[in-house]
C-alpha cells in the first residue's frame, strides 16, 4: 500500500513503533511490582493508560504528517491527475491509521503476555484479552477522528494542531475519571458523546476488581456499563460524521 510506504519513511512512525514496545514494557514492570500482578491488570493498563494517553495522540500526530504530506511536497496535483479522488486519499490514509492502531494494541498485548510468562504469571483470559486488544485499537482509532477532523479544518497550522491534540487528549483523559460524567445513562451527555469516557464505560466491565475499594466502585459503576454493540454503534455514527466532514473540508481546500 502506497500510504503505508509513506508512513514508513516518516521518523514519527518509527518513533511511534518504538513507543508501542517501550510504554507497555515499562507499564507491565510497574504492574508486576505492584499489588495487582495478574494478566488482566497488565492488559487493563496497556489498553487504557497506553491507549488513552499515548496511542490516541500518536494517531492524530501521524494524521497531521500524513494529511499535510502532499501539500508540503506539492504533489497533490499529481495525485489528482492519476486520477485519485480526494475522498479515496482520505480513506486510504485513515485505513493505514486504523491498521497502525490495531498493531499498536496487539504489540502491547504481546509484550504483556511475554512479560507474564517471564514472571510466571498465569495467562488467564488470553483469548478474551487478545480480542479486546484488537477491539480497543479500533475504538481508539474512532476516538481520534474528531481531533483529526479539527486538524484538517485548521489546515497547515502545525502549532495549533499540536495544541488541539494536547487539549483533546487531556480533556478526554480527565473526563474518564469523573464519576459525574461516566456514571450517566446513555444519552446526549459527555459520558456518551465524548469517546474516551464512552470507551472506558465499555472496557471497565471486563476488569477483574481486586480489593474492597475496586469491588465497591465496580458494583456502583456496573449500572452504567455500555454494551459492545452500543459502544461500537455510537462510535461508528461519530466516525461516519467525522469522515464525511473530512472529505468535505479536503475537497474545498485549494491545491
Regions found by a protein language model. Give the residues of each.
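Aromatic- and glycine-rich beta-strand/loop motifs that create alpha-glucan
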Residues: 1-17
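Helix-loop-helix units of permease transmembrane domains in multi-pass membrane transporters
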Residues: 66-98
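Secretory targeting signals
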Residues: 21-64, 92-158, 224-228, 232
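Cytoplasmic juxtamembrane interface segments
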Residues: 1, 67-80, 147-184
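Terminal transmembrane helical anchor/hairpin motif
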Residues: 34-42, 162, 166, 170-249
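Residue-level recognition of transmembrane alpha-helices
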Residues: 16-20, 93-94, 165-166, 235
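Short cytosolic juxtamembrane segments of multi-pass membrane proteins
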Residues: 249-255
Amino acid at each position: 500500500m502506497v500510504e503505508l510506504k509513506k508512513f514508513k519513511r516518516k521518523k514519527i512512525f518509527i518513533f511511534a513503533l518504538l513507543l508501542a514496545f517501550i510504554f507497555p514494557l515499562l507499564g507491565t514492570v510497574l504492574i508486576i511490582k505492584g499489588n495487582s500482578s495478574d494478566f488482566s491488570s497488565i492488559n487493563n493498563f496497556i489498553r487504557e493508560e497506553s491507549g488513552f494517553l499515548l496511542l490516541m495522540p500518536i494517531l492524530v500526530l501521524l494524521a497531521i504528517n500524513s494529511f499535510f504530506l502532499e501539500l508540503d511536497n506539492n504533489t497533490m496535483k499529481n495525485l489528482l491527475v492519476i486520477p485519485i479522488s480526494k475522498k479515496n486519499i482520505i480513506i486510504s490514509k485513515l485505513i493505514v491509521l486504523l491498521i497502525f492502531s490495531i498493531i499498536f494494541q496487539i504489540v502491547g498485548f504481546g509484550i504483556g503476555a511475554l512479560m507474564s510468562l517471564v514472571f510466571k504469571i498465569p495467562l488467564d483470559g488470553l483469548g478474551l484479552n487478545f480480542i479486546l486488544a484488537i477491539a480497543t485499537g479500533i475504538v481508539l482509532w474512532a476516538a481520534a477522528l474528531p481531533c483529526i477532523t479539527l486538524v484538517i479544518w485548521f489546515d497547515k497550522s502545525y502549532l495549533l494542531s499540536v495544541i488541539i491534540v494536547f487539549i483533546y487528549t487531556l480533556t478526554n483523559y480527565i473526563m474518564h475519571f469523573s464519576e459525574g460524567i461516566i456514571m450517566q445513562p446513555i444519552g446526549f451527555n459527555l459520558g456518551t458523546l465524548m469517546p474516551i469516557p464512552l470507551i472506558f464505560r465499555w472496557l471497565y466491565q471486563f476488569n477483574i476488581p481486586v480489593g474492597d475499594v475496586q469491588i465497591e466502585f465496580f458494583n456502583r459503576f456496573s449500572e452504567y456499563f455500555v454494551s459492545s454493540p452500543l459502544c461500537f454503534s455510537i462510535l461508528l455514527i461519530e466516525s461516519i460524521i467525522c469522515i464525511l466532514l473530512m472529505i468535505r473540508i479536503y475537497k474545498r481546500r485549494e491545491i
